[in-house]
Amino acid sequence: MTIRHQGQQYRPRMAFLQKIEALVKDMQNPDTGVKTQSQRVLVTSVPHAMTGGDVLQWIIQRLWISSLEAQNLGNFIVKYGYIYPLQDPKNLILKPDSSLYRFQTPYFWPTQQWPAEDTDYAIYLAKRNIKKKGILEEYEKENYNFLNKKINYKWDFVIMQAKEQYRAGKERNKADRYALDCQEKAYWLVHRCPPGMNDVLDYGLDRVTNPNEVKKQTITAVKKEIMYYQQALMRSTVKSSVSLGGIVKYSEQFSSNDAIMSGCLPSNPWITDDTQFWDLNAKLVEIPTKMRVERWAFNFSELIRDPKGRQSFQYFLRKEFSGENLGFWEACEDLKYGDQSKVKEKAEEIYKLFLAPGARRWINIDGKTMDITVKGLKHPHRYVLDAAQTHIYMLMKKDSYARYLKSPIYKEMLAKAIEPQETTKKSSTLPFIRRHLRSSPSPVILRQLEEEAKAREAANTVDITQVMSKLDRRSLLKKELPPK
């Protein structure tokens, strides 16, 4: 049997169908496969039929799996249309009894190139309409009317094809005609499933490109591949022990700055009511904490990422008459992550301020980088200054950063840095125990308490004698008053 391997290159999630097809081919082996024979269905003898129990037993013996796994796999095969039931076509499960099944012809397998188009489905429905004399199921009637409106321009062709196929089918013998009808019905139950059934072939939109297609390599592509492998050979390999040592060193270096592992100083504001931690670690606080200043010495990225560290580094660069380097880097960051509707204006402004001949804050970059940058500014975009920005970044990292750490500015900042002490709590002797926040009472509960208090006041018993005595006193006072 020759099976075309088509239709899967655009459907990466359907690649497992190849394994199912290989298993179905083994099932159809005349020597080691599932035993088939002619079976009588209604008044017709159908050739090459088999029972669900035989299929289940063959799967168990062939794959050495449990009966439950074999049942699930059998249901899987039936749902994808490789085996179809003869007696209950809509029930796409493998019954482990004497229910009759039949192998689907490879022409109707899901991996074939031809798709289930509307025209083919319309011809099938028109043929069933002729055969059943207009008695179709409800969902088939709806699809028939919908397709009649959708492809009305070629409906005459659909009816003509349906009549020709119906006429050709009547010329076949009864068994072949019944088998072909079952095959078509099983195919369309999978590809145009009725309402309420699971569409197992729903894989989404087709891909525009074929990821498995073998493309013809050009000379340029081969040269790039050779260059890549040459660079890979020249690249120095690192032992796993060295890599793991680097990870351990990094973890030890940053462990003191991990708020979860080492805690927060003076206290965690999310657990306590103290907001001093936020005040001490504000972006541009006047005097930062010692831990924050020490972190600037870890690497250059930690320094330039911190707004306070960047401010201190800018002050140092101005003293060295190279403050334009950090200014250019910040302008490039604003170009990349700022308002993109003003990219062109920002790029022109950066060029005039930092790159143009005789610019007020001219930066020193090599000629090759300058040529790439100027050429890219003809069509500006957010990454047009990446080459120049990388050059300046590496210049500051390798030259200015080391001098900054040795400068009096950094040493003075480190000496003045605050080292907050942990807030002690009398209620707890263990450092990891934290006082939980007390939530304020819910407004709903407060309203309920007020209503209950009013109800209690209204329910208090009233002394009638006291009320009557008060009314009598008021009436006597009115009588004793002299007339005006």
Swiss-Prot record:
Gene Ontology BP terms: G protein-coupled receptor signaling pathway; intracellular signal transduction; negative regulation of signal transduction; regulation of G protein-coupled receptor signaling pathway; visual perception
Pfam families: DEP, G-gamma, RGS, RGS_DHEX
Residue ranges of every copy of the G protein gamma domain listed in the record: 219-280
Superkingdom of the organism of origin: Eukaryota
Residues making up the signal peptide according to the UniProt record: none
Post-translational modification: Phosphorylation is decreased by light exposition.
GO annotations of cellular component type: cytoplasm; neuron projection; plasma membrane
Subcellular localization: Membrane
InterPro entries for this protein: DEP_dom, G-protein_gamma-like_dom, GGL_sf, RGS, RGS6/7/9/11, RGS6/7/9/11_DHEX_sf, RGS9_RGS, RGS_DHEX
Keywords: Membrane, Sensory transduction, Signal transduction inhibitor, Vision
Residue ranges of every copy of the RGS domain listed in the record: 299-414
DEP domain residues: 30-105
Membrane disposition: Peripheral membrane protein
GO molecular function list: GTPase activator activity
Main function: Inhibits signal transduction by increasing the GTPase activity of G protein alpha subunits thereby driving them into their inactive GDP-bound form. Binds to G(t)-alpha. Involved in phototransduction; key element in the recovery phase of visual transduction.
PANTHER family in the cross-refs: LP21163P, REGULATOR OF G-PROTEIN SIGNALING 9
Assembly, per entry: Heterodimer with Gbeta5. Interacts with RGS7BP, leading to regulate the subcellular location of the heterodimer formed with Gbeta5. Component of the RGS9-1-Gbeta5 complex composed of RGS9 (RGS9-1), Gbeta5 (GNB5) and RGS9BP.
Protein name: Regulator of G-protein signaling 9
Species this chain originates from: Tamias striatus
